[in-house]
Amino acid sequence: MTAYAIASLRNTTVPNEEVFDYMERIQSTLDPFGGRFLVHGARLEEIEGTWPGGVVVITFPDLAAAHGWYDSEPYQELLPLRTRNLDGEVVFVEGVAPGYDPSTTAARIRAEVGRGVHGGASA
């Protein structure tokens, strides 16, 4: 199942040489794991609420590839260039299968709630 790394980054308005170095080198850490950028520094339109910063979305073939990339020695060596200069959060999330229908998930969760076995809102 396709997986995504999603980052919400703040304090990104004053890039420095470490940030440039990070940006120039990150793709080479993604390539061995099939990672590629879908969103990076694009214009952001707030529709509901206030978004705290920029958005980055990277796609991977699956969660194992995403974790493999993040835990890899080349990325771990590069990571401090970002964490020293940008604040934010990063999550991994699985995508949905082609043809996904949210009404099926609603029915499953409704049944779980009815049986008292569903404790959260995750799909």
Regions found by a protein language model. Name each.
Residues 1-54, 61-68, 94-123:
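Short S/T/G/P-rich N-terminal loop/turn motif that feeds into the first structured element of a domain
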Residues 64-99:
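A contiguous, mid-protein "functional segment" used to position or interact
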